[in-house]
Amino acid sequence: MSTDQSPCPSATGAELLPPPDGTLAIVPVGDIRLESGAVIPDVHLGVQRWGELSPGLDNVVLVEHALTGDSHVVGPADDVHQLPGWWNGMVGPGAPMDTDEWCVIATNVLGGCKGSTGPGSTAPDGKPWGSRFPAISIRDQVTAEAALFDRIGIHRLAAVVGGSMGGMRVLEWMVGAPERVAAALVLAVGARATADQIGTQTTQIAAITADPDWQGGDYHDTGRAPTTGMGIARRIAHLTYRTEDELDHRFANHAQDGEDPFDGGRWAVQSYLEHQAEKLCRRFDPATYVLLTEAMNRHDVGRGRGGVAAALAATPVPCVVGGVDSDRLYPLHTQQELADLLPGCARLEVVHSRDGHDGFLTETAAIGKLLVETMRLARAHR
């Protein structure tokens, strides 16, 4: 994959966007003022696009990625992205998000490590931001995305779609800027972080920051990174993404092939989790993992808006809310609350899966149907 150089900082309009073939561009969006009052100067976002803009700029669909995702929604692995697209089959000609009709845009989130300004980026003093990068919230991530669309001249999105941390951003778009969203798809997330989620996620953060190579978060120029800690964090997280039934069906209490757990060898499930950890450590910045996990802990659409019920009740955006029946990280009742409180939601759509939280990624046929329904709403309300 080629990567466009950053457009001229003074550029505005559609010329800021990358080509419609999935090429990654690094787009300047200006200074971003955070909820905390802090300002991150000269923010850039990694952006990919599939499909052409309509003359009226009214066909844009924003796809929001989850914690360790990025803007690479579809496409093969390449020199920029070590993995294929995380929603392959969902975008393209004739796909649920049909690029013969829609212009699909995805950003790498503020604080990310795939083209967007984050802890590993260069600060104004020429050194990595590291521990100096400000704490951010999900709302701050949406503020950065809104700044991108302001610069392009897109004032209303035909749809915003996403799951997990991406679903948090969808909700913040709906609640914080309903006039800018014609339709939405919210998957595998709740209105606020729960104690269980915060407990699991702070444990992952502790694993990373306890690694001696964390170095207070200022490791980027040292040649050492806290990959041992992040590997442990990923193993913890992955257990919450899957289910007891699925894991036991695949691995039971079997030893890894050719190894004996009674003689220092590994269990099959242990080997699987180590593999997941190693894959992440090759492609993801631990400081971004900590920063974004902290942002998820802060997720609460009701903060400063009179509580969850009041915030959702005041949100008129037509939407589809979906949940996975086996999800133990974001249980189905958290999506039921959204469906009950959002005026624009007709009912909760339940995805049946053995895969738990990851079902919003793996159950492509079911998710494709929800995307088709969301695009129908977008067509009717844009």
From Swiss-Prot:
It catalyses: L-homoserine + acetyl-CoA = O-acetyl-L-homoserine + CoA. Its main location: cytoplasm. GO terms for molecular function: homoserine O-acetyltransferase activity. Keywords: Acyltransferase, Amino-acid biosynthesis, Cytoplasm, Methionine biosynthesis, Transferase. One of its GO terms (cellular component) is cytoplasm. The active site is at residues 164, 327, 357. Pathway: Amino-acid biosynthesis; L-methionine biosynthesis via de novo pathway; O-acetyl-L-homoserine from L-homoserine: step 1/1. InterPro entries: AB_hydrolase_1 (IPR000073), AB_hydrolase_fold (IPR029058), HAT_MetX-like (IPR008220). Its EC number is 2.3.1.31. Pfam families: Abhydrolase_1 (PF00561). GO terms for biological process: homoserine metabolic process; methionine biosynthetic process. The keyword Ubl conjugation does not apply. Belongs to the AB hydrolase superfamily. MetX family. This is Homoserine O-acetyltransferase. The gene is metXA.
